From Swiss-Prot:
Gene3D superfamilies: Hexapeptide repeat proteins, Spore Coat Polysaccharide Biosynthesis Protein SpsA, Chain A. The keyword Nucleotidyltransferase applies. This is Glucose-1-phosphate adenylyltransferase. Keywords: ATP-binding, Carbohydrate metabolism, Glycogen biosynthesis, Glycogen metabolism, Nucleotide-binding, Nucleotidyltransferase, Transferase. CDD domains: ADP_Glucose_PP, LbH_G1P_AT_C. It catalyses: alpha-D-glucose 1-phosphate + ATP + H(+) = ADP-alpha-D-glucose + diphosphate. Its EC number is 2.7.7.27. The gene is glgC. Alpha-D-glucose 1-phosphate binds at Y107, G172, E187, K188, S205. PROSITE patterns: ADP_GLC_PYROPHOSPH_1, ADP_GLC_PYROPHOSPH_2, ADP_GLC_PYROPHOSPH_3. Belongs to the bacterial/plant glucose-1-phosphate adenylyltransferase family. It comes from Rhizobium johnstonii (strain DSM 114642 / LMG 32736 / 3841).
Amino acid sequence: MVEKRVQPLARDAMAYVLAGGRGSRLKELTDRRAKPAVYFGGKARIIDFALSNALNSGIRRIGVATQYKAHSLIRHMQRGWNFFRPERNESFDILPASQRVSETQWYEGTADAVYQNIDIIQDYGVEYMVILAGDHVYKMDYEWMLQQHVDSGADVTIGCLEVPRMEAVGFGVMHVNDKDEIIAFVEKPADPPPIPDKPDFALASMGIYVFHTKFLLDALRRDAADPNSSRDFGKDIIPYIVKNGKAVAHRFAKSCVRSDFEHEPYWRDVGTIDAYWQANIDLTAIVPELDIYDKSWPIWTYAEITPPAKFVHDDEDRRGSATSSVVSGDCIISGAMLNNSLLFTGVRANSFSKMEGAVILPNVKIGRRAQLKNVVIDHGVVIPEGLVVGEDAELDAKRFRRTESGICLITQPMIDKLDI
């Protein structure tokens, strides 16, 4: 007798990705695009991680709420995420703010971005909702979180991880009992409460929530009727449930997808220039903590058909070379030297130029004899011949967006203002 296979919970779930934020701490990098649309890892966009996690977890209904400067993001998803088939009970919906509930307002907060599309959610009739932030870099199997949600009988299950206490000021922070039931929750506290047995760490929300659909829709309607609400999950919905219902914490270590279990679970907010630079540079390690080469859990994305990368010239002072670097397709390293750098598609690096600790977005052109250290260079920038960045901190700060740790963000308008 063949045992009947139980359908994974993910097949009766919808992933709802919140992708409307600007990400203002990324400064000029989000002047033309929303944070989820920012390039990452040589080939992908940040949003591809949440979407790939959902797909790889078995979720086949996905909605993405967009708002701020969404053209680049929408175009990317239309090109790279158009393979869902309704005849297989699959769907992929892009949901710009469109005043579906109110004719006068855009999305007012994260909860409102779900509430305004409540009719679409009801039409699909799924049992569970997985609410995701579209601007984090990590690999996670949501099926484990769904299973914990069902087993615990929770009203909401919240993904969480341990972070250094002083870094927790930008997150929702929770206090749990020995059953991982949340007994207190505060959004972005100035003085984050520590984990009882780990005074230097706090338990931070990942912005991942699992609900039974009916419970979520009732909670959203109640919140929408409250004139004092800010329409936000972290500020309104979650604290209400913690106080009046049952909220359970799901620890990221239980569902993190990693190739090497000696590595710590990898999750990055990449919300600042420093964090964005570091997360990209992390990928140049011999064995990176975030494995983008894992074929069992691929990061799906839109990929142009491009020729291979090419390295040319082999003279003593003019040798195309790269060490400890990631170089994407259609790059030509023509007598240039790379070290500990990550190049996206279509970069041209010309003779005698040197790059170290460089994160270079697509279609950048590096002029001859340029010297670039610890930089993030935006899409399509043309670096003039002989430009030096990373040696004179004072000059760099006048010309570019330089962080306190010395990372320089370079955009084309900044280059256009140079007197060289």
